[in-house]
Each structure stands twice: as structure tokens, then as C-alpha cells.
């Protein structure tokens, strides 16, 4: 798998007025429900007064974020490395580098990583955390 884009972001930084954070300083957090899924909470609701949150997501090969909904958040995915499949409101979407997917609030969705894992940015409006 070509992880160049992922590596660029994992070694990247967040720069906003008054704040500069290297992504390497942000710890990976295990997903509280889904095994093999880890997140870096790049921007949280605390940073945006609850308006949005931004997360780097790493899904291990063959693992999944199983079917779920977000009652109040619109969610976007931007695939930056690896491959997989997203089922978005019953429609299968092939996930590969460059794909962007949008899940409106209350829409069931799930994401399964391929054999090489899956790396994406997930944004939530309003903030998930």
C-alpha cells in the first residue's frame, strides 16, 4: 500500500491563529466500541465551540466500523491511504485514495477496511466530541 499521503499527515500539523500542534503529539485513541479502529482527535468541539470536529482514523486490515448512525451529526470521510468499502444508506461505495463520502445525520453507515487497512479523515458537523 502506498502510504505517502497518510505519512505526510501523520507527520503534519494543525496551524490556526494562536495554536500550532504537531500531529505526532496527539495520541492515538482506541475506538470505544470497534476493535482495530484508532483515532487521533485533531480538532474537537472544545476548539470550535461545538461547531465541528476533525479526526484522523486508522482501521486495521479486515476490521470495521460496524453499522451505526449519528443522530445529530453530518459526517464526511476523505480516504488518504488504503482501501475498503463503505455502506452508506444501503449503497456500497468503494473506498480508495481520493474518495470523499458524506453521511447525513440519521443515515446508517459502516466502513470495512481492505487487506491493507484504511486511513481517512472523518469530520463531524456539529462536533462529535
Where are these regions (language model features)?
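Short acidic-glycine-tyrosine-enriched beta hairpin
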Residues: 90-105
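A short, N-terminal "cap"/entry segment at the start of jelly-roll beta-barrel domains
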Residues: 1-51
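Short, charged/polar surface micro-motifs in flexible loops or helix N-caps
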Residues: 47-50, 59-63, 83, 126-129
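A generic "binding-loop/recognition-motif" signal
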Residues: 61, 72-73, 91, 107-108, ...
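A short hydrophobic beta-strand segment most commonly corresponding to one strand
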Residues: 56, 76, 102, 116-129
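Conserved short histidine dyad/triad with adjacent acidic residue
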Residues: 40-43, 53-70
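Short beta-strand His + acidic residue motifs that chelate non-heme Fe in jelly-roll/DSBH
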Residues: 66-67, 86-87, 103, 109-115
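Glycine- and acidic-residue-biased ligand/ion/polar-headgroup-sensing regions
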Residues: 72-75, 79-84
Amino acid at each position: 500500500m502506498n502510504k505517502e499521503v497518510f505519512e505526510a499527515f501523520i507527520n503534519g500539523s494543525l496551524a490556526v491563529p494562536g495554536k500550532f500542534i504537531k500531529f505526532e503529539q496527539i495520541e492515538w485513541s482506541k475506538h470505544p466500541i470497534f476493535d482495530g479502529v484508532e483515532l487521533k482527535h485533531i480538532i474537537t468541539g472544545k476548539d470550535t465551540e461545538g461547531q465541528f470536529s476533525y479526526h484522523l482514523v486508522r482501521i486495521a486490515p479486515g476490521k470495521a466500523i460496524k453499522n451505526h448512525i449519528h443522530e445529530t451529526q453530518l459526517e464526511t470521510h476523505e480516504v488518504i491511504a488504503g482501501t475498503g468499502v463503505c455502506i452508506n444508506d444501503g449503497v456500497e461505495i468503494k473506498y480508495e485514495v481520493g474518495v470523499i463520502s458524506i453521511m447525513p445525520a440519521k443515515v446508517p453507515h459502516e466502513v470495512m477496511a481492505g487487506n491493507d487497512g484504511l486511513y481517512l479523515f472523518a469530520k463531524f458537523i456539529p462536533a462529535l466530541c
